[in-house]
């Protein structure tokens, strides 16, 4: 059994706890049903922050306003990452309490020149994003989400496949009757990356006249798809070149289990940590130390690029806030980062009785036992991990126990079985105390993942307690 401050199911034994657990789960389920891309998460995050009285840091700078304890600001990076600050009583130089999560999830990205017709069928070519089992993405309804940037400077939002009456798309699979060779392949090769092409149409464009020459018949189905896209979104085929379109599982997240104790949906990794991180910050009164929530992109492919955690965005925004507070210098910025505490809010693998052989039971995460702390992640001898200091873990234990938060500690499977990484090491490189902390997930990186509602609620409580450290 993993170590925990309360036993399995105790979350529900306290008075009125089930209602609180289920009410917050309903809020979260709506969030992940609406927000299936990093851009959509940022857009909804801005709405939540504005409603809570947060100002855009860009506007504060433009107006040459000063910031003080009690002020609340946010900043957006290229519409794909966001950071928010709840300025506390002590100087930022003395350190911040930071909640950091990622809002990108494994998916299929549409290529820049994707559309083609083959034997009367029109397909979109894709390039998968992040670590996926490719065979899981066939024969399942998919939706298209994203943006198309036009040459005139405008950006068109695209969502196809989410409304109950809307159409969906998908990737075909080979029928079992003809699959003898396919069934002999290793799982990694059963469906290959270049075979993940999405079927989007089969009806030719209706011709204005009765012309019958071959030129009119060529790519008639593709022409029909382009005509429909032009009619609804005003986009041409060449506009795919400057588009960011993502194929994701269609439809809303759902309650899971006969007792409704779980949620199944796309993108729990890592929006199940991102949402309570943001809500914990919004719920907080003025803290002693400045509270921060940063939600970033590109974690699933190494946290690279301008919107990933490895960019200078976070440091730059801390510098801007310190400047508005009248306390900026390069040395003070470095001190602020080194004196900070961070929870790298990312998911952990939930123990699964169907695959018990890959888990070491004493150090596994379990549904219903609260938020998960991973002192270290990595693989094959902790390679690539952030290993949190014992002293920092000791402080967090007291904070969680004082706030009556159910928590557990875990590793990602047995030694040498596998492993994984998060954004933790990137912030730790700035010399701050960082630990991975999040929620146990089954089916991680599958189109539909599963989490426990009790763990979600305890994690919200844990994040709220952390911000008051």
Spans of model-derived segments:
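Single conserved hydrophobic/aromatic residue that forms the stacking wall/gate
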Residues: 1-12
């Amino acid at each position: 059994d993993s170590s925990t401050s309360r036993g399995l199911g105790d979350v529900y034994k306290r008075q009125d706890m089930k209602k609180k657990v289920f009410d917050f789960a309903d809020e979260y389920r709506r969030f992940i049903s609406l927000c299936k891309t990093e851009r959509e998460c940022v857009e909804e995050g801005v709405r939540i922050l504005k409603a809570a009285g947060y100002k855009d840091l860009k506007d504060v700078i433009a107006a040459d306003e000063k910031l003080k304890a009690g002020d609340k600001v946010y900043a957006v990076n290229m519409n794909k990452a966001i950071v928010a600050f709840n300025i506390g009583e002590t100087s930022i130089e003395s350190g911040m309490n930071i909640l950091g999560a990622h809002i990108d999830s494994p998916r299929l990205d549409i290529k820049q020149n994707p559309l083609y017709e083959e034997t009367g069928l029109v397909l979109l070519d894709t390039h998968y994003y992040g670590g996926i089992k490719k065979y899981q993405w066939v024969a399942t309804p998919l939706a298209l989400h994203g943006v198309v940037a036009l040459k005139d400077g405008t950006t068109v939002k695209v969502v196809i496949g989410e409304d109950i009456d809307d159409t969906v798309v998908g990737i075909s699979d080979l029928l079992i009757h003809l699959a003898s060779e396919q069934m002999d392949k290793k799982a990694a090769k059963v469906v290959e990356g270049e075979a993940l092409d999405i079927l989007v149409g089969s009806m030719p464009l209706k011709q204005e006249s009765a012309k019958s020459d071959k030129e009119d018949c060529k790519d008639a189905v593709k022409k029909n798809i382009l005509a429909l896209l032009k009619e609804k979104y005003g986009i041409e085929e060449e506009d795919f070149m400057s588009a960011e379109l993502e194929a994701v599982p269609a439809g809303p997240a759902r309650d899971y289990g006969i007792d409704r104790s779980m949620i199944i949906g796309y993108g729990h990794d890592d929006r199940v940590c991102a949402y309570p991180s943001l809500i914990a910050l919004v719920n907080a009164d003025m803290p002693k130390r400045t509270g921060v929530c940063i939600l970033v992109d590109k974690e699933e492919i190494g946290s690279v690029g301008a919107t990933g955690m490895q960019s200078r965005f976070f440091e730059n925004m801390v510098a801007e806030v310190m400047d508005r507070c009248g306390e900026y210098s390069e040395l003070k910025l470095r001190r602020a980062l080194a004196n900070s505490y961070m929870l790298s809010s990312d998911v952990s693998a939930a123990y699964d009785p169907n695959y018990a052989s890959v888990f070491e039971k004493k150090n596994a995460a379990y549904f219903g036992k609260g938020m998960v702390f991973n002192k270290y992640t990595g693989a094959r001898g902790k390679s690539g991990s952030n290993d949190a200091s014992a002293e920092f873990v000791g402080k967090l234990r007291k904070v969680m126990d004082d706030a009556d938060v159910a928590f557990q500690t875990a590793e990602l499977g047995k030694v040498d079985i596998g492993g994984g990484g998060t954004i933790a090491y990137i912030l730790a490189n700035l010399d701050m105390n960082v630990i991975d902390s999040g929620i146990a997930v089954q089916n991680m990186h599958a189109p539909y993942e599963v989490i426990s509602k009790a763990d979600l609620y305890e994690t919200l409580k844990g994040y709220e307690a952390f911000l008051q450290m």
